Swiss-Prot record:
Keywords: Ribonucleoprotein, Ribosomal protein, RNA-binding, rRNA-binding. This is Small ribosomal subunit protein uS4. Residues 105-169 form the S4 RNA-binding domain. It comes from Haloquadratum walsbyi (strain DSM 16790 / HBSQ001). GO terms for biological process: ribosomal small subunit biogenesis; translation.
């Protein structure tokens, strides 16, 4: 018997072929360097859970946003900690979030945006090959959600050959 849960952490689309949806998914896969559509669907399911929780809190508060925020303080703090919401956003902003808001907080995307890699796929490779550290600890999961406080602590591992600024694979050296 295997350990762990055998449940899927995502939902597949209801209709197998919708040209517009497939084109949008392909664009997101390329823009964020995702390995396959399962990663995208997992992120979409995560966003769906956020929206569902926000709707539940607003419903419990009978539409009063300030009461809903008090009920869901931990939920909103978590979204603010990850940088999905800014400090002055209220709970109704959660309903307007897009999947790209979640994808922007992945370690892979942040490594690329900070200029440590020249492409999103190269950022993924650097992470998987243990060249990237967050707060001094190696991270090998490109899908790790990065907190706002951790974003400035992303760097190359000191033992990595990529720590040398003259390394040919470094994004800064290619300019």
């Amino acid at each position: 018997m295997s350990t762990g849960s055998n449940t899927k952490r995502y939902e597949t689309p209801n209709h197998p072929y919708q040209g517009e949806r497939i084109a949008q998914e392909g664009d997101l896969l390329g823009r964020y360097g995702l390995k396959n559509k399962e990663e995208l669907w997992r992120t979409q399911s995560e966003l769906r859970e956020y929206r569902r929780e926000a709707r539940r809190l607003i419903g419990e508060a009978q539409g009063d946003v300030s009461v809903a925020e008090a009920l869901g303080e931990e939920f909103l703090d978590r979204l603010r900690r990850y940088g999905i919401l800014s400090a002055d956003d209220d709970i109704s902003k959660v309903l307007g979030l897009d999947v790209s808001d979640i994808l922007e907080r992945r370690l892979q995307t942040i490594v690329y945006r900070q200029g440590l890699a020249s492409t999103p796929k190269q950022a993924r490779q650097f992470i998987v090959h243990e060249h990237i550290t967050v707060n001094g600890a190696r991270v090998t999961r490109p899908s790790k959600m990065v907190e706002e406080t951790e974003a400035n602590a992303i760097a190359f591992d000191e033992n990595s050959p990529l720590a040398d600024s003259l390394h040919p694979a470094r994004a800064e050296g290619q300019e």
